[in-house]
Amino acid sequence: MDEDEIELTPEEEKSFFDGIGADAVHMDSDQIVVEVQETVFLANSDVTVHNFVPDNPGSVIIQDVIENVLIEDVHCSHILEETDISDNVIIPEQVLNLGTAEEVSLAQFLIPDILTSGITSTSLTMPEHVLMSEAIHVSDVGHFEQVIHDSLVETEVITDPITADTSDILVADCVSEAVLDSSGMPLEQQDNDKINCEDYLMMSLDEPSKADLEGSSEVTMNAESGTDSSKLDEASPEVIKVCILKADSEVDELGETIHAVESETKNGNEAEVTDQSTSIRVPRVNIYMSASDSQKEEEDTEVIVGDEDAGGTAADTPEHEQQMDVSEIKAAFLPIAWTAAYDNNSDEIEDQNVTASALLNQDESGGLDRVPKQKSKKKKRPESKQYQSAIFVAPDGQTLRVYPCMFCGKKFKTKRFLKRHTKNHPEYLANKKYHCTECDYSTNKKISLHNHMESHKLTIKTEKTTECDDCRKNLSHAGTLCTHKTMHTEKGVNKTCKCKFCDYETAEQTLLNHHLLVVHRKKFPHICGECGKGFRHPSALKKHIRVHTGEKPYECQYCEYKSADSSNLKTHIKSKHSKEIPLKCGICLLTFSDNKEAQQHAVLHQESRTHQCSHCNHKSSNSSDLKRHIISVHTKAYPHKCDMCSKGFHRPSELKKHVATHKSKKMHQCRHCDFNSPDPFLLSHHILSAHTKNVPFKCKRCKKEFQQQCELQTHMKTHSSRKVYQCEYCEYSTKDASGFKRHVISIHTKDYPHSCDFCKKGFRRPSEKNQHIMRHHKVGLP
């Protein structure tokens, strides 16, 4: 006997029919009636179901009325031929009944030992449904019931150990019920079952410890309770129990995991059966091909063992089980379905899938491999980083893994998205042990919190040193400060800072400020205590101090603008509120909001004026005003001249005001002539206009002049080979030896080699001595 086949022995002490119920009370010696799952014998292999012709002439099509499955299942040529019928095969009879059992005499049949109590089967190699003999006539059949022997056992599929826990597998899809007669035509349905349902074929994996592993190999079934008690050999592996569930169409068994519906275009095993006489369209049914048809391509279903959703569905439904030989498992076909399961360890699931697929599609001859072999890949992952996942298997074999959130149920394609989403949940944040006191950061590791707090300390240190030394500007980050200093460097390369009182030039403003304080300190006696900047007048220093204090005493009367300088306020009013400035009369100082009112008021002054100017249309109200107008406008002579600058004025009052400016301001003397002015800008304008020739291009090093720029560029090349003189006290450098000497003496030396001939006061440069003599001793230089 093959080691995969199990020898069955009858149970003599207790009959199978002891607890069947009231339907089995009236029985005689020749009749045994059992009400079990309804099964319809459709036809032999010559029956055509909706243009469906099986390839194997010995195959039989069976319709399961209760479970709505149309199956062409096994090789019947070895079972149904009269010459091959033996005592080793149990061939029960099919009996018609709608809801109750009927007594049918079996004396007419030529199988004398069919109801013998001692019949056993040494090799029961049959599929899910037991087939009947050809000698039984079922032409007037509406619904059938199976009549089986008391020693017929429940069906169990023996498999290798897959998992230690019982887990159910959803592997079937919803189909519709249809009953076919012997000619292959559909019959009217007498049940009021739902047409659209969702039936699932449930497969569960039991532990070996649940079976009584003793010497006896008897297997019995209790038809009422639906529970089983099995006794197997000690070497027998785990058991896969197969049952079909009747699911409610309004309830989703998988919850939010997946809504899997078979496509009518992709599923090649579905067909529609139509009544030829009534032309009534019967709901679609599933047709399963025989295992001998190796030419047909069949879609495979990958079975994923779930831990949560699939495990909870098998407990609520009865189980219909059968036992078959392991060598004939290849003849049983599973419907195509989408399966989904939540798992905590995807690697163990892959191992279970490989084992289950190999057992359900075992074919030693290499004829038909329904599920491709998969190699298990075990990767050790830390338990703290495990995430719950869901696996979806499509009919074409493609799998899709998603990661659902354990708090809200949302699904994500990758673990990274799930991890980012989970961090926003308050439930996740509440589990953190360590929380940062400076921000919202939290963590479970103390070292991570320590590293995070160090980043706060570095931020505080950088905030203290983010002030620019050149312009005193506060910056937010140290990197921004470096970029800002680079801007100062670039500006210094392209721009040179020049002293307006001497020939000193430098690339940085700070060095120029230092030069002004050291060299020209006497010219700027009023120095700011905050930044060290010097001013000539205390009013200028007072205005500058407002920059540091933030004081803005000048307010705009039309808006909220404030300024520290009155000139800035005037500019603001002219640019922003030019339309709002009232019109003011130049004679009586009256103000007007409208231009028309101002013009009407001016007419009144014109009418009151009786003194007409003989040179123009000007009128005055008195003679003195008319005389002043004629002298200032129509007279070229300036009889009133200034003694200090020889500037002429029309009136003595104007000259008096001009002389006051000479007394209040210091005079700036021209180096080339006797011209002096209290305004340094006027002095610069004088030098450019009077003492500068019309030469556009001049060398800055040797002061040589050129008429064209190309000549100046050619001349500048001659200075490139000269020696560069670098000052050891500052960053000043030059290629002119005399200029370098002058720089050292004037900036970094306390000696005053040039002394005044009248007061013996010393100066660093001759120009300073000459300016002193002209200003204080009133002596012209030759």
Swiss-Prot record:
- What does the record give as the organism's lineage? Eukaryota, Metazoa, Chordata, Craniata, Vertebrata
Query: Which cellular compartments is it found in?
Result: Nucleus
GO MF terms here are: DNA binding; zinc ion binding
Alphabetically sorted, this entry's keywords are: Activator, DNA-binding, Metal-binding, Nucleus, Repeat, Transcription, Transcription regulation, Zinc, Zinc-finger
Q: Among its keywords, does the record have Zinc? A: yes
Q: State the name under which the record lists this protein.
A: Zinc finger Y-chromosomal protein 1
What does the record say about domains? The binding of ZFY to DNA is mediated by the interaction of the GGCC core base pairs with zinc fingers 12 and 13.
Which organism does this record belong to? Mus musculus
**Entry's Pfam families?**
zf-C2H2, Zfx_Zfy_act
Q: Which InterPro entries match?
A: C2H2-ZF_domain, Transcrp_activ_Zfx/Zfy-dom, Znf_C2H2_sf, Znf_C2H2_type
Question: Gene3D superfamilies in the record, alphabetically?
Answer: Classic Zinc Finger
Give the PANTHER family listed for this entry. C2H2-TYPE DOMAIN-CONTAINING PROTEIN-RELATED (PTHR24384:SF189), FINGER PUTATIVE TRANSCRIPTION FACTOR FAMILY-RELATED (PTHR24384)
The gene name reads Zfy1
